[in-house]
Every structure is written in structure tokens, then in C-alpha cells.
Amino acid sequence: MADKSLTTTVIGSFPKPSYLPIEDWFNSARNDGGMDTERVTKEFTQYIEKKSDSDEHLFVRAAKEVINLQIDAGIDIPTDGEVRRENYIHYHCRYLEGFDFKNLEHRVLRDGAYETNLPAVRNKIKHNGSSYSVHDFKSSQSVSSAPVKFTLPGPLTIMDTTADCFYDDRPKLNRDLAETVNKEILSLVNAGCKYIQVDEPLFARQVDDASSFGMEGIERCFHGVPKDVTKIIHMCCGYPDHIDDEDYKKADPESYHLLAKEVDELNIDQVSIEDAHCQNNLELLEKFEKKSVIFGAIAIASSRIEREEEILSLIHI
């Protein structure tokens, strides 16, 4: 058997199986003719108010199917596909005090890529003490033969996907959100999770904020995490709500070059960047002298499936 020179992983999310009682936000938005997440936000709010314990086996089944798909494809470090989350970012926020999911606020997101009505920050943000990540991780790890990576949204990305009606102080809001992520991460560490990823796609869109206070937020997220846990930050340039959308407004991949030095100094182990959809100048990799790079080699927003030779050529094996 040939020796594998690279460890493989995925970023996180998978399409939800149709038998789940919740829907992917982008499918719901597409039904309304765009990327408006308001309907799925309201529907999930209603769902959690009356959800049944009998649904649990469906989420376990979905996680097992998604994990096995990855393992069968040769993925070394799978995720649970985020199958329990109606929205990757808002799912975390539902376990925080200070958020209002009933009275939504209209905002324009992602540099104008889309607009919608969002959950609002109405009071000081604090973790409510109930760690969702431990239950979700243990459930997924119990049906996986490989170590499961757990993913969480980063503070800056949460800020750009919610409506601040209280702080009017972006660094302060970022710090408070980072504290909530840190509480989940430390709970994951205690539960035995060895691969923890914080997603900050907004770093690529808001370079000044990322440099000014976003890096500090990431440091706070991973504060107190021991060395035997792999700490990861993911920075993509944005993905559309459906495949083959060539007009979606992505972040400028030059942002990677602008942030590389600061990211390289963070107390993390790995940085995840996309390439298949933006084709970086690969001199970028030389700027990450202290970090392992998770290199996005699959064009996941395209219906065209690459040949194996194309992937090997891209990563120069």
C-alpha cells in the first residue's frame, strides 16, 4: 500500500439528508428566490420550541452517513457535516444570552453579496452555560472510526452575520463573542476532541478589522487549549448558495497575502485557505513559516468533478 504523504480533511458542512426535520438555510432561501435566511431562522426557532427527543436518532443517522462518506473517500479527519445546524453561525448564537431570534433586523452582508433579516444583539453577550458542542461532538465521534474535527464560527464572522443593536463597539463585541467560543472549545477539549477549527471567512473581507482586533479574538478563542489539541483557523473567500454561480461576490484572495504574517504568529497550528476557486499565487504558502496549511484543492461550488490527475497537479505530488 502506497504511503500517503498528505493528511486529508474537509472544511465542515455537508448538504442535509431530506429525512432530517430541519432544512439547509440555502435551500430555504433558494425557494424564496435568493439568499434570504429569514424563513429558516424563524422555522428553526419554532422547531426548537417544540422539538421531540425522537428526532435525535435522525441526527445521529445523518452524522454517521456523512462521516462514512468521508472515510470511504479517504478522508483522514472528517466532520459531522454540521447536520444539526440550521445555520452554521446562528446555531452557536442560540446558546448565548443577549441574542434576539424573534425580532429580526434587516442587514446587507458580505460586502453586498446578499441581504436578509438577521438575529439581533439586544444585550451583553454571555454564554448561557449549556455546551452544545460536547453533545454534538460525542454523538458524532461515537459513530466514527476516525477522529472527528469540530468546527465553530469565529467572532468576526458572527458579527457580520448578526445585527448589533446594543454594543456599537466592534472590538468589545468581538471580545465577548470570543469568550463564548472559548467556553465551547474548552468544553470540547475536556470531552476529548483533538481537532478544533474556528471559521473566520470574514477575515478575507474585513482585513482591517481582522488585523485590528480579529487576531486577538482568535487568540482568545483558543486560550487555555493544550498542545495536544490541533488548533485550526479557516479563512475562505466566500461561497454562493448554489453551484456554478460565477457571479457571486467573493472576497479578494489578495487578503491572504495581507494577513499571512499575522496569522503565522497566532497561537494556532493550522490555517485553512481556499485555492481551487481562487487560484492563489502559491508564493503565499512560503509566508506561513510556522503553520501547516490546509489547502483547498477541490472546487466544491462547481458541478464539474475534477479528475484525480488535476488534483495531484494542483498540489504538486
Please report, for each region that a protein language model flagged, where it lies by residue.
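Domain-level signal for soluble alpha/beta catalytic cores
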Residues: 1-315
